[in-house]
Regions:
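Short, surface-exposed helix-loop/turn micro-motifs enriched in polar/charged residues
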Residues: 82, 211-212
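Short acidic/His-enriched helical or mixed secondary-structure segments at domain edges of catalytic enzymes
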Residues: 221-244
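PAPS-dependent sulfotransferase catalytic domain
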Residues: 1-187, 242, 249-254, 258-286
């Protein structure tokens, strides 16, 4: 039997719960309380440093398209080292699963053990993303409908992450959930809030990592949203971008009802109706 690949792609649109699941993985693998500083050991797919180190080149000398062309090769170098070390690595991905200049996905297919796609009600995403980026909600709602939306795409300075093309929120969801090159398990953020033990057990089972009920329960307790929020307040978190707010801000569903203006909620529902309906976000008003 062929040995399974070592990279689990943990994919999501920004502010959809990706980091919370990374914390669960950290707590599960270490069998200790989740530590935010340990998440740096789970480098995201768009890490410029990881890309440069893997290929031994300086990405500052490359265009964004040239980097996209080489990113799968960098993933394969990292995966090969993980295979030698006997390690299975969870890697955060915010890119939509678009194809790059050579016609292949921007992350490596051959390195992939599987994909976990985390989806969240886009109305809650909009509120969370506005706080995270210090942008207006009007701006964020328009951004979520932009076909050219991207992270790390600044032209006048070098960011620690390489460009990540997002597309619209709907395009992002469909790019991961309507493909079969990297088998995906779709996890709703709301279900994770409701029953994190069941969701994390399903993730482990899907990834072929084995489900030990006591270990799962301990990992979930050790990475609770409250604990992560308290830790961030005490020690900070390097993934926080807004100086005025926490990365782990509220961690609940349905907050859009009191935070998002009605006309913006209606625009999101119109822009993303088909995908929202498919994943149950328009049934009973989310």
């Amino acid at each position: 039997m062929m040995e399974r690949a070592t990279t689990i792609w943990l994919a999501s649109y920004p502010k959809s719960g990706n980091t919370w699941l990374r914390a669960m993985y950290s707590a599960w693998s270490s069998q200790e309380q989740a530590r935010l500083d340990r998440l740096q050991g789970l480098p995201m797919a768009a890490s410029r440093q990881a890309f440069d180190d893997a290929l031994g080149i300086d990405s500052a000398d490359l265009t964004a398209d040239e980097i996209d062309l080489l990113r799968p090769r960098a993933d394969e170098v990292i995966a090969a080292q993980d295979r030698r070390d006997g390690e299975i690595r969870l890697r955060k991905v915010h890119d939509a699963l678009f194809t790059g200049p050579a016609g292949e996905p921007v992350v490596s297919v051959s390195a992939a053990r599987c994909a976990i796609y985390v989806i969240r009600d886009p109305r809650d995403v909009a509120v969370s993303l506005a706080h995270h980026t210090d942008r207006s909600m009007d701006y964020v709602v328009d951004y979520m409908a932009s076909h050219v939306a991207a992270l790390g795409a600044a032209a006048d300075w070098l960011e620690p992450q390489v460009r990540q093309r997002l597309g619209t929120w709907s395009e992002h969801v469909e790019s991961w959930t309507e493909q079969d090159v990297i088998p995906p398990l779709v996890v709703r953020y709301e279900d994770c809030l409701r029953d994190p033990v069941a969701v994390w057990s399903a993730v482990l089972d899907f990834a072929g990592l084995g489900v030990e009920p006591d270990r799962v329960s301990q990992a979930v307790a050790a990475s609770s949203f409250t604990r992560l929020q308290e830790q961030e307040k005490r020690e900070g978190f390097n993934e926080r971008t807004s100086p005025s707010g926490l990365f782990f801000r509220q961690g609940r569903s349905g907050g859009w009802r009191t935070s998002l203006p009605a006309e913006l909620a209606a625009k999101l529902e119109s822009d993303h109706q088909a995908v929202m309906q498919r994943f149950g976000y328009l049934e009973g008003d989310g």
